[in-house]
Amino acid sequence: MLVLTRRSHQVILIGDNIEIAPDRIGTSVVKFSVRASGYPIARGERPAAGDASKDGVLILARKCGEQILIGDHIVVTLLRICGSCVKVGVTAPPEVRILRDELAA
């Protein structure tokens, strides 16, 4: 698991087509913007057929310890809320590149 600290609207890039960023950081809940063209997105448990988003864009509220599943192999976990920032853990296969947006240029 790669752990990154992000502030509101700071993007994490996963692979070539996935972007996730905390939009609103509250004291106990964070709203994430998830853009994942071509990947099903689920709220934290493996979805039943037809139960996940297929359009690739979601706004999801997560509490500490809750997950967002992207495709079959990528898991994003809200680990901690630290005032105006969050610690996010990303678990992905070793061949999938994970970058902070500011390093991608």
Predicted segment positions?
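Compact, glycine-rich, soluble single-domain proteins
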Residues: M1-A105
